[in-house]
């Protein structure tokens, strides 16, 4: 579960290492984001020479969440960290590689490019 001021690890090669959530997309009163939800974030830590710089405002999709997500069969999928992938306005990833596993819920939310780039889908 991600809300405003939550810091997330970046799971792609855009150059950002850590982002801070500043808004959850999907309505003016929406408070929480889970796996597959889009957030607006600012880059808090970045590597030199990357696509994004520190202070940039970006859109990102949550790919791993400590809170986890409930599946149709009643099971839960949980991760050890909160992580996101930076996306463009057309919902495609800005980077060319995805690091670490991603949840199967991204396929239901139509983030096929992220699912295909990910090394493991849980």
Curated annotation (Swiss-Prot):
Keywords: Ribonucleoprotein, Ribosomal protein, RNA-binding, rRNA-binding. Part of the 50S ribosomal subunit. Forms a cluster with proteins L3 and L19. In the 70S ribosome, L14 and L19 interact and together make contacts with the 16S rRNA in bridges B5 and B8. PANTHER family: 50S/60S RIBOSOMAL PROTEIN L14/L23 (PTHR11761), LARGE RIBOSOMAL SUBUNIT PROTEIN UL14M (PTHR11761:SF3). This is Large ribosomal subunit protein uL14. It comes from Lachnospira eligens (strain ATCC 27750 / DSM 3376 / VPI C15-48 / C15-B4). It comes from the Bacteria. The gene is rplN. Binds to 23S rRNA. Forms part of two intersubunit bridges in the 70S ribosome. InterPro entries: Ribosomal_uL14, Ribosomal_uL14_bac-type, Ribosomal_uL14_CS, Ribosomal_uL14_sf. One of its GO terms (molecular function) is large ribosomal subunit rRNA binding. Belongs to the universal ribosomal protein uL14 family. GO terms for cellular component: cytosolic large ribosomal subunit. One of its GO terms (biological process) is translation. CDD domains: Ribosomal_uL14.
């Amino acid at each position: 579960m991600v809300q405003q001021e939550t810091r997330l690890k970046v799971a792609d090669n855009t150059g950002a290492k850590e982002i801070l959530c500043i808004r959850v997309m999907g309505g003016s009163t929406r408070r929480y984001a889970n796996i597959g939800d889009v957030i607006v974030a600012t880059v808090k830590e970045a590597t030199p020479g990357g696509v994004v710089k520190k202070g940039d405002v970006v859109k990102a999709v949550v790919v791993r969440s400590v809170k986890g997500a409930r599946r149709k069969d009643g099971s839960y999928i949980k991760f050890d960290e909160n992580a996101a992938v930076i996306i463009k306005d057309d919902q495609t990833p800005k980077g060319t590689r995805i690091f670490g596993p991603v949840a199967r819920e991204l396929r239901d939310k139509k983030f096929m490019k992220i699912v295909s780039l990910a090394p493991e889908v849980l």
